[in-house]
């Protein structure tokens, strides 16, 4: 049996180069340099090209986009209702150390989401070591419990789905590459695991020689693997990366940053043009020795290209950055300069980003539900664990909302209810949880005291323009009910000569 690259799935072969490009675009640094994504000039030798790769900076937008998505998705962790799994001895250890590497289940799922955004999808296997323990408690003492492992797409070589009589697609074959070890310059050692519904095979490969080293029964009766896409595609087993467009635009920016670097370097350091027999250098204060009989037309001179194109290249880079923001619906989030969007345009941008994040949360929720079904199957429990990811995300422009509320308050609308609700909205922008609930109670209590005009009060008798104030005029203007006889009027105080200038 052959287990090398010749037996990979056709879609694996179609997407392998793209996966490498996406992960290099996300990683940046030396990984991106090694990808050699700069266009080589005509007659450019290997050393000059390597130097240009080393001098060209890389502005990593892909990593920024992926982590902004992740920060929004995991700002509020998912809620889980375990039902019959409550009290299971393996539940708490699994939640605290899901992959037997010290990471909690939330941290593991967040990492899966990040790498799914990069590659387009990842696979998660939930396995359980073989055990001879008689009870679940003995298994826990031996650390025999379910655990999860993530496989990135380049390590899942082949897969197959089959349609069941009910019409549902079921994973019936999966081949994963578990480890690759470079023994020496000519020898590579690789371990593969092949899953089917009834057996599990472990294969060991050294270069082109493959050998099956272990066969076990699949006691679960199904392949314990879950496919987690970043975005669904029309091809089963292949997801769409969040970087599918942004990575190519980032590469175009990388090309133009190389042009910027060369324009600056060459325009600041002109090239000395001289005849072969002239003794000269281009350094500051250098002395040029010319033959006495040299033709005047052959005098040395400096060749300096124009740097006028620099602004055009920089403007092109800015346009591409704006394109990346539009592709990822990040125009209102990633903008570093003053945003000139209208309120409606910005709200639309937030809504589009919120819809994208909500779709991602639904995919994660579905994947986690499948993982908990596998957990319950391994532990012999009823698979009734419920998972709830946030359906909407707090994407708000706090400055604009606060300004709007302040303007609304200053309009002078005669409504105590409206004033209370405005105060509550302002509190919502600043506080949360218990502090917010307490603030709402205080606002309502304060409004009931300040807005209580059931008893008579005193009002001034005259307007500022000397017009007479009627007894119930103030109540009518602020929307309160009239009282019998109206409010009492304050009698004007007669001024004396000693009151002049006193305030």
Language model segments and positions:
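Short secondary-structure capping micro-motifs at structural edges
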Residues: 108-112, 308-311, 356
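Extended, regular secondary-structure scaffolds
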Residues: 113-117, 121-233
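Extended, charged amphipathic alpha-helical segments
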Residues: 207-348, 448-459
């Amino acid at each position: 049996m052959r287990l090398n690259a010749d037996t990979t799935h056709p879609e694996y072969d179609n997407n392998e180069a793209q996966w490498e490009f996406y992960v290099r675009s996300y990683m940046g640094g030396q990984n991106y340099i090694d990808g050699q994504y700069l266009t080589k000039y005509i007659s450019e030798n290997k050393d000059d090209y390597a130097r240009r790769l080393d001098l060209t900076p890389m502005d990593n937008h892909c990593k920024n986009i992926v982590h902004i998505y992740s920060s929004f998705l995991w700002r509020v962790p998912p809620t889980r209702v375990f039902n019959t799994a409550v009290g299971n001895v393996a539940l708490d250890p699994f939640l605290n150390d899901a992959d037997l590497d010290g990471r909690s289940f939330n941290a593991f799922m967040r990492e899966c989401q990040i790498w799914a955004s990069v590659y387009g999808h990842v696979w998660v296997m939930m396995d359980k070591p073989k055990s001879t323990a008689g009870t679940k408690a003995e298994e826990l003492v031996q650390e025999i419990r379910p655990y999860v492992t993530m496989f990135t797409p380049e390590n899942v070589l082949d897969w197959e789905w089959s349609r069941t009589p009910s019409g549902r697609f079921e994973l019936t074959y999966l081949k994963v590459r578990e480890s690759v070890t470079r023994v020496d310059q000519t020898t590579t050692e690789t371990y593969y695991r092949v899953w089917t519904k009834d057996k599990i095979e472990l294969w060991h490969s050294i270069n082109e020689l493959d050998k099956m080293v272990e066969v076990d029964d699949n006691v679960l009766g199904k392949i314990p693997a879950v496919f987690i896409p970043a975005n669904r595609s029309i091809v089963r087993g292949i997801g769409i990366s969040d970087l599918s467009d942004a990575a190519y635009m980032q590469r175009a920016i990388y090309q133009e940053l190389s042009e910027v670097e060369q324009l600056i370097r060459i325009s600041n350091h002109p090239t000395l043009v001289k005849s072969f027999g002239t003794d000269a250098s281009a350094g500051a204060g250098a002395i040029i020795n010319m033959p006495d009989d040299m033709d005047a037309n052959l005098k040395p001179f400096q060749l300096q290209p124009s740097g006028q194109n620099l602004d055009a290249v920089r403007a092109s880079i800015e346009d591409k950055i704006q394109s990346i923001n539009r592709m990822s619906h990040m125009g209102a989030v990633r903008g570093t300069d003053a945003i000139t969007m209208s309120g409606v345009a910005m709200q639309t941008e937030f809504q589009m980003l919120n819809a994208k994040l909500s779709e991602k949360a639904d995919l994660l929720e579905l994947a986690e539900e499948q993982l908990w079904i596998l957990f319950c199957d391994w532990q012999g429990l009823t698979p009734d664990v419920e998972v709830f990811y946030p359906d909407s995300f707090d994407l708000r422009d706090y400055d604009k909302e606060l300004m709007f509320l302040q303007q609304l308050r200053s309009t002078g609308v005669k409504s105590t209810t409206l004033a209370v609700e405005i105060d509550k909205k302002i509190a919502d922008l600043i506080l949360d949880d218990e502090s917010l609930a307490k603030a709402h109670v205080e606002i309502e209590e304060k409004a009931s005291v300040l807005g209580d005009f059931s008893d008579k009060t005193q009002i001034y008798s005259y307007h500022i323009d000397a017009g007479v104030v009627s007894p119930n005029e103030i109540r009518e203007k602020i929307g309160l009910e009239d009282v019998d006889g109206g409010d009492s009027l304050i009698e004007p105080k007669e001024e004396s000569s000693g009151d002049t200038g006193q305030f």
